[in-house]
């Protein structure tokens, strides 16, 4: 899934079930700091 919030936070995540009980999840995020970076 991916999402973008009003406060300039963006996140993407994906995952899959490996075996019976193990989730493998990968993702990334980005945001703009108060300094604008």
Curated annotation (Swiss-Prot):
Domain Chitin-binding type R&R: 1-37
Organism superkingdom: Eukaryota
KW Kinase (keyword) present: no
InterPro entries named in the record: Insect_cuticle (IPR000618)
Keywords tagged on the record: Cuticle
An MF annotation (GO) of this entry: structural constituent of cuticle
Function: Component of the cuticle of the larva of flesh fly.
Protein name per UniProt: Larval cuticle protein SC4
Gene source species: Sarcophaga bullata
